[in-house]
Amino acid sequence: CREGRYGQCMGGGGWILGNEIDGTQAEYVRVPFADTSTYPVPVGTSDEELLMLADILPTGYEVGVLNGHVQPGDTVAVVGSGPVGLSAIMGARLFSPAHIVAIDQADARLDAAKLFGADTVVNNAHDDPVEVVQALTDGLGADVAIEAVGVPATFELAVELVRPAGRIANIGVHGAPVTLNLERLWTRDVTITTGLVDTYSTPTWLRLLPEHHVDVARFVTHRFSLDDFIEAYDVFSRAAETSALKVVLTRSA
């Protein structure tokens, strides 16, 4: 905690809400260690904008963009265009990369990726993203490959996308072992990072929102009242069919 690595706090800290204790879909919520996780709301921000800070934007930004050390002029490949992948695209755009390539198998999410700042989109169900990235980089590969899905195939794709001396930033939450081809990675000086979000970037995003430097409201694709709770969850669970990104529930009047 003293190092600002709040996701790894010892003695009862770290990832608590929705993990070790119940989440926040309740009338009242007790927030442990609130000094490191609550912030005053700036004037000029909406509730929907603030929802995106808990925690897709810090996740894509910290675990993807900052861990990947995105630099001006980089070519960045983002594997997965769900809300966290889109957050990584939005965050990467702040660093003026030369090119951002978004990769997904859902055309609706690739359309969203264009709105969030991707220069090129690739549906890897039909096209080879490795060929696309190599064509953009004279055969070198991406400076940074960000994995935002969490399955073995997408991590292995990130390995294929990255250039020698490049960086792979893994955001995806993996539930199964992944093959790590070290015999190929170590000779190419590839750096791999992983991690939980620490949300230390939340103050940065809170400064950006009132000035409209980023448009985070576009994450919200569906809105429901709490009376339609079950329908809202059904829509979100079928995101590939419904084109849902983020679903907002509001209390009935």
Where are these regions (language model features)?
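Mid-domain Rossmann-like dinucleotide-binding core that forms the NAD(H)/NADP(H) cofactor-binding site
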Residues: 43-127, 131
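A general structural signal for well-ordered alpha-helical segments in protein cores
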Residues: 6, 25-26, 38, 57-60, ...
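Glycine-rich phosphate/adenylate-binding loop and adjacent beta-alpha elements
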Residues: 1-38
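Structural detector of well-ordered beta-strand residues that form the stable sheet scaffold
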Residues: 77, 101, 167-169, 193, ...
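C-terminal hydrophobic helical "lid"/dimerization subdomain
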Residues: 156-160, 199-253
